[in-house]
Curated annotation (Swiss-Prot):
It catalyses: guanosine(2445) in 23S rRNA + S-adenosyl-L-methionine = N(2)-methylguanosine(2445) in 23S rRNA + S-adenosyl-L-homocysteine + H(+); guanosine(2069) in 23S rRNA + S-adenosyl-L-methionine = N(2)-methylguanosine(2069) in 23S rRNA + S-adenosyl-L-homocysteine + H(+). The gene is rlmL. It comes from the Bacteria. It comes from Shewanella sediminis (strain HAW-EB3). Its EC number is 2.1.1.173, 2.1.1.264. Specifically methylates the guanine in position 2445 (m2G2445) and the guanine in position 2069 (m7G2069) of 23S rRNA. This is Ribosomal RNA large subunit methyltransferase K/L. The keyword Protein biosynthesis does not apply. Keywords: Cytoplasm, Methyltransferase, RNA-binding, rRNA processing, S-adenosyl-L-methionine, Transferase.
Amino acid sequence: MLNFFAAAPRGYEYALSLELADLGASEIKESVAGVYFSASLELGYRITLWSRIASRIILVIHKGPCESPEQLYNAAYGIDWQMEFNHRSTFSIDFHGMGGFINNTMFGALKIKDAIVDRFRDDDCPRPDVARVDADFRIDAHYRRGQITIGLNFSGPALHKRGYRSTTGEAPLKENLAANMLVRSGWQKTPVTLMDPFCGSGTILIEAAMIACDMAPGLHRERFGFEHWHRHNDKVWQGLLDEAKARASIGKTRCTTKFYGSDIDSRLVALAKRNAENAGVLDLIEFDVSNALNVKVPGESGYLISNPPYGERLGTVTALLQLYYQLGDKFKAEFGGWNLAILNSDVELLSALKLKADKQMKMNNGALECAFNLYTVHAENTRRVDPSKINRDGDVSDIAVPFANRVKKNFKQLQKWAKKEGVDSYRIYDADLPDYKVAIDKYLDYVVIQEYTAPVDIPESVTKRRLTDVLITLPSAIGIDPENIILKTRERQKGTNQYEKIQANKLELITTEYGAKFKLNLKEYLDTGLFLDHRLTRKLVGQKSKDKDVLNLFAYTGTASVHAALGGAKSVKTVDMSNTYTNWAKENFALNGLNDDKYQFVQANCMQWIKTTHDKFDLIFIDPPTFSNSKRMEDSFDVLRDHVALLSSLIKLLNPGGEIIFSNNKRKFKMEIEALEALNFTVKNIDNQTLPLDFKRNPQIHNTWLLTHAE
């Protein structure tokens, strides 16, 4: 008997051990990412030819303790390598595992290589050559917890490479993953009608058809690792190949199982057909180009096993949630009596199906950990309301009903108001309901959802489910394309969080506000370039700017400066520490045709600039951060602690009768009025003048003050 190790991705061990037992292996022992077993040479060949789940089969030559480089060298040197391969054959070493004295897999591979070369030399035999690519004889070494296992890569190239795949589509499933899905779903025990409405390049269906036809998965492979092994018995191997070919021929003629595959991408369907033809099962599978939501149920019962699309790019998550929700509706309405098995890396997408799983498993798709859920659709289940009908029929989805009703009500009111007001970007919802802690802003034909950090006492699973429900419900509630919804997660403002990049890609739009035009960037940063709650404050700045010298401090993208310029300011100076936002402010001026020299831009630490400038102004607008400890500032800044010092430092910049419009977003901010009055400031709160209708539901979003200094 020979000792083997069947390697497989983590999570496949159980199914692999069952497969090995069915094939006749003995002394089966599950390990991490594989299974040890014993078998005769003939059975080792058979397992290599017939295993659908293993990644590779390793013939174990040595296994023992290893605590030092010397022990590793001695273990490899002690093997009679001339019994394993000829010196004329090239060899390579795949070393796996680290720990202890092994801090680099290359080090382990070199030690074994040195031992092999030295052993050949000491046995008076020419040394074999190392080949990094396509070696004749591949040695596999695995180090774990003080144990070294050295063996021959018996199977050769990865076993999931069956030989029938011509090219791959996007994110193709590996063949052994598809086989594992078929085993764990229960379909393999009783092959019945099988369909995959997201078939891609056809892997699940092809693997299933090969199972139903009793076709060995290795039958189309051209190369195996044992071919250059000295103890290889080609007669036995050829006999197993002949047997497998005969079984496949008989199995195909007896196969009565129906297979149905479809995909919305015609190129992938064409590829799936080519792959199925290469595998010899094309005539068993009915392929079609179709949207999964439109496929017809091919019988009263069967299995639907699939890997629907999933992705993590912002801007696609809402569309995917809509797809999964609609799939759940279709399954419940049309697939009564069917078993479903769905693989996905995003449990929130699976939750959008609104189906209760009979079983939930973990299964790796390459390095990506996925959930593999099994469902039974009972025939008595009834269809729920389709969310796409909310607007058309006046119905409300059974998901997040209070949220849907509130958003619809808000949107109906604000849509008319915004058109009359002359703005096309506004807030629809701002955590109006405690269970749905999000802010929703509409920018022309797009919506940005910002998720606030939930309280620590709310389980993460609850907040995720609520957010999922928001994303499912919103498109139909306000009639927006799911592809035009952008999701962002943010905490309450902390320091410079709002200025950090979150994506490399951009989505730039031009919005209009009281005649002013501003550039928006909806994806690249947490904020979009326009603080919507300051809309009336900017308008006020414009109204007060006629024939005045205006200063905008902590200017961000210079939107208040644009209003000042359009309001007829004599001059406008825009100061911000960020080069990005200073350039953005310049773009906003250019959009409005404001190119005069009287409009100046300064990139500087505002605190330091105030100390050094000698300029004078009639109107200063200042909207400092709530808190900042930027590396480019010498000291931290806290608006509650430091606002008196900040405002007093502006006195020297004011012309006689000059005014300051001071705003901040600190909740529960308390203005030190007495201290400011002692500095000859007249202080007036103007929140009522500067809180737009779309922010009336959240009066603490900001506070705004008008200060006049008396000489």
